[in-house]
UniProtKB/Swiss-Prot annotation:
Basic residues bias (residue ranges): 373-389
Entry keyword set: ATP-binding, Helicase, Hydrolase, Nucleotide-binding, Stress response
Region described as Disordered: spans on this chain: 368-389
Natural source organism: Bacillus cereus (strain ATCC 14579 / DSM 31 / CCUG 7414 / JCM 2152 / NBRC 15305 / NCIMB 9373 / NCTC 2599 / NRRL B-3711)
Function: DEAD-box RNA helicase. Probably has an RNA-dependent ATPase activity and a 3' to 5' RNA helicase activity that uses the energy of ATP hydrolysis to destabilize and unwind short RNA duplexes.
Higher taxonomy: Bacteria, Bacillati, Bacillota, Bacilli, Bacillales
GO cellular component terms, A-Z: cytosol
Name assigned to this protein: DEAD-box ATP-dependent RNA helicase CshC
Length: 389
């Protein structure tokens, strides 16, 4: 399939070191190339971004100096990650992209549009604002992609989404992607799309090389287990908590134990978040602590471990957290630190997901699978009779 694409895409694919398409890419690329509307669901880390970018970049006409593809995403971080992929796969060509996010200087964004980007990646609100200012022309847009569409629906961005769609020609293609396509999101997508093709890839089909493990410990022991995991060597981890007010407390305790740790806060400024992520990607930090909201949109290629310091409330949260390791066919480890009372909830997650969770202990700096204790032999009941000699 890659061999049938534009030479610049083949070269970028080889340069990125990819060997074969993931399951979502195999299923979605032909349908998108045909121009059909698509609703796609695939776990985090399975190559969803390239599943839509590759066919759409292949179809772009560089001679038409207007936006031809628009990608809408719910968070600043996700917008920037998608934009980076566009830059990587169009390097050395006439095709360029522009990222348009809320909160950034709109005058600079208008200047970006004067350079004739063929691919626009942005937040629904800011893109709609530029359309209304008549700075972003949509008449040549052939495809609109909605990445993490469940979050777009959840964050009540549908008004902006509908207005952006209305600004394009009627024959445009709509593509909806999500790691967890909720019923509400799927219903909303079906209302907007025309005879959409449904592409759904399960965790089992995605050939994940992620190992899901758990350790039973008391709540007070969890920080020490994080320390022991980090000392296993060459570990780069994100640890998740539910309570944002505990982020700094736990981070300071880990730093006191000589770990290069930092907290990622949802309310941190763009500059603070970017500085933290730069330090983490550059190896100055070995572990990030975050909540689900704070970690939204984070994408780190070489993340070795995801640690659930606190078990998430839902299966969907578990999927989103855990999908940050083992991306694009790489190996990864997910460790849940659970109290004896939490074990039952975790095993319910395992049953719903169809995943085998390995119960482990730590011994001499390594994971060791917990062996079930042999049942004690019952002593024969005393009958009062003496054994015959």
């Amino acid at each position: 399939m890659i061999k049938d694409m534009q030479p610049f895409l083949q070269q970028a694919w080889e340069k990125a070191g990819f060997k074969e398409l993931t399951e979502i890419q195999k299923q979605a690329i032909p349908t998108i190339l045909e121009g059909q509307d698509v609703i796609a669901e695939s776990p985090t880390g399975t190559g969803k971004t390239l599943a839509y970018l590759l066919p759409l970049l292949h179809k772009i006409n560089p001679e038409v100096k207007q936006p031809q593809v628009v990608v809408l995403a719910p968070t600043r971080e996700l917008v920037m990650q998608i934009h980076e992929e566009v830059q990587k796969f169009t390097a050395g060509t006439e095709i360029s992209g522009a990222s348009l996010i809320g909160g950034a200087d709109i005058k600079r964004q208008v200047e970006k549009l004067k350079k004739h980007p063929r691919v626009i990646v942005g937040s629904p609100g800011r893109i709609l604002e530029l359309i209304r200012m008549k700075k972003l022309k949509m008449h040549e847009v052939k495809t609109i992609v909605f990445d993490e569409f469940d979050q777009i629906v959840k964050q009540k961005m549908m008004g902006a989404v509908q207005d952006v769609i209305k600004s394009t020609m009627r024959d445009r293609q709509l593509v909806f992607f999500s790691a967890t396509m909720t019923k509400a999101a799927e219903d909303a997508a079906r209302d907007l799309a025309v005879e959409p093709q449904l592409v759904r890839v399960t965790r089992a089909e995605s050939k994940s090389l992620v190992e899901h493990t758990y350790i039973i410990c008391e709540r007070r022991e969890k920080n020490d287990y994080v320390r022991r995991i980090m000392h296993m060597g060459d570990v780069k981890a994100v640890a998740f908590l539910n309570d944002p007010f505990r982020l700094d407390e736990i981070t300071e305790k880990l730093k006191f134990r000589k770990m290069k740790a930092a907290a990622l806060h949802a309310e941190a400024s763009k500059q603070e978040r970017e500085a933290t992520m730069r330090a983490f990607r550059g190896g100055k930090l070995e572990i990030l602590l975050a909540t689900d909201i704070a970690a939204r949109g984070i994408d780190i290629d070489d993340l070795t471990h995801v640690i659930h310091l606190e078990l998430p409330d839902t299966v969907d949260q578990y999927i989103h957290r855990s999908g940050r390791t083992g991306r694009m066919g790489k190996e990864g480890t997910v460790v849940s630190l659970v109290t004896p009372q939490e074990e039952r909830k975790l095993l319910q997650f395992a049953k719903k997901l169809g995943i085998v969770f390995t119960k482990q202990e730590m011994f001499k700096g390594s994971f060791v699978e917990t062996k079930p204790k042999a049942p004690k032999k019952k002593k024969p009941a005393f009958t009062g009779k003496k054994k015959p000699r």
